[in-house]
Each structure stands twice: as structure tokens, then as C-alpha cells.
């Protein structure tokens, strides 16, 4: 007997909140009732369950992807219109896949990226709805741009990028910046007649268009 199908939505949502992503996926297969749209928050520990659920969940509000997942599986067919919070932890992606992620999340307000590996040279965070952005220890070899006109909070702890071509922070209220300069960047900065400035937090703040408080 399928008892899951007879449960009220509120009770079923409460029960699902205690299950792992794997258990939720298995429950959806065993039940005659479509329970995937009831899920509000999901953590994807492995790629197999990520690709399975992301294509089905249209009402997802919070999503966390981690554990070394390669985001190259993300396709233009994925659309998460209600997603408010996205956490990317220890994932890899190419720039082409990363850039189609934002149009797929038109309501995204909070983005956290930790231990990210960018496979291509340049990357851009572009979102008109984004209000909170936290970046911690991403790995890339090129420039990093911000096209986030409604961003209110920026937390940026990382190595200095080669360049910041675009820094759209029209409504930024608070920024916490903690950056590390590589040995190669220091050597180039110290070279005679070199126009590449030695980066520090003040310099990066100016390049990003952020006025630091005294």
C-alpha cells in the first residue's frame, strides 16, 4: 500500500526535510504520487542524483551542489524559476556552463561559491536579481567580472584575478574583501617599468569600484 500518496502536503514536506537526497529520490520512485515538486531544499552529494532531481524540481528554493561535482552536466534545458539560494562547494565548471546557470535562475538572490575550480580562463557572475554573493577560494587563471547591479553584500576571499574588466555594483552596501597575491604577480609588479600594479585590498577595492570605509 502506498501510504505516502495519502499524506497532506505540509506533513510530507516536513518528512522529506529529514531525508537525504538519495532517500528522497528513492521515495519518489516508490510512490505513485509526484513528490519532487514539494521539495524546497536539496543537497546534491553526487552527480547521479543531481542530474536526476534538477530536471524535475521546478519549485526548488534552495540548492547546494558539492563534493567534487563537475557542472558540465548543466544544460540550457534546466530551469529553476523559484530558486533563491544556490551554494556551490568544491565543484568544477567551464565558463560556458557557468554562464548559462544564471539565466536558469532568474529569481536567484544568494550565491555562495567555495573551493571552485574554473576550467577556462575568464568568468563572469551576471545576475540582476542577486543580492548576496560570497566567494571563497576559487581557482582560475584569468579575469573575473561582476555584473550584479542589485548586489547588496559581497564577501570575496580569494587569490587576485588577472583583471576585473567589469564591476557593476550599483547598490552595493557592504563588501568584505580578503585577497592573496601570488608570487608570479609580485614578481611582475616588482619588475622595472611594469605597469601591472602590486595588488592589495585597497587597490582591488578601487578596481572593483568599492569605496572602503575609514
UniProtKB/Swiss-Prot annotation:
Name the record gives this protein: Putative F-box protein At3g58910
Domain of life, per lineage: Eukaryota
Residues in F-box domain copies: 1-47
Natural source organism: Arabidopsis thaliana (Mouse-ear cress)
InterPro entries listed in its UniProt record: F-box-like_dom_sf, F-box_dom, FBL60-like, LRR_FXL15/At3g58940/PEG3-like
PROSITE patterns according to UniProt: FBOX
